[in-house]
Amino acid sequence: MCIFVDMLIDTHCHLYDEAFRDDFEAVLARAREAGVEACVMPGIDRSCHDALLAVADALPDFAFPCIGLHPTSVGTDWEEELAFVKAHLADQHWYAVGEIGLDGYWSKDFLKEQIRVLEEQIVLAADAGLPVIIHLREATEDFFRVLEDLRGVVLRGVMHAYSGSYETYRRLLTYADFKFGIGGVVTYKNAGVASALEKMSLDDVVVETDCPWLTPVPFRGRRNEPSYVRFAAGKIAQIKDLPLDSVAAATTENARRLFKL
């Protein structure tokens, strides 16, 4: 399937990852050829900080940096990692606090600490007037408890790699101005999010890759890259029975407004 459009924004792209070291310029060329006009780059932890900033500095009109502590990086040194985020939040212009959230899939050993770290980073984002990028996996009710505890905080952001139900989508919108990141998973056979996406408003959707991971069909099993965001957009268009250009235009505008690009 050949899919090319005039404009797309990849709202979740780890372009600084070592997976792109050997062919970085070719990856960029393919992204631009595919109509990708910008990539939002979430942080993970302090280990990737310098690499992320190097890409952002090299591509100031294309790669937009974010800072945050990923839930799977919350371990015995979580206090030092969180202090790093706090110390560097005022260093430069960030476009979001993220990737932050809760992950109970790999381990629940540090879930209590994940919750503490998430709460503090949500408040940091609100105080800085920044959106959040939320990673949520097998900890949905814990996340809702966090949202309930922070009811007074003005919150906006992206539910990254959204794979929940329509009911969960509606429930999340009662707490915050969330957009919902749709990526390669939507192209997989029996992807559960497809039924929710049918009923979701396109005004609430952004597209993403999470590259180098979560590669869409027809390239599943290989390294993901920003140019492949077009396959997520194409699948959204198919599911919602809309022209691809309409999906591209709407999701791009949603991303621009959220991240103030």
Where are these regions (language model features)?
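Mid-domain alpha/beta scaffold segments of enzyme catalytic cores
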Residues: 2-261
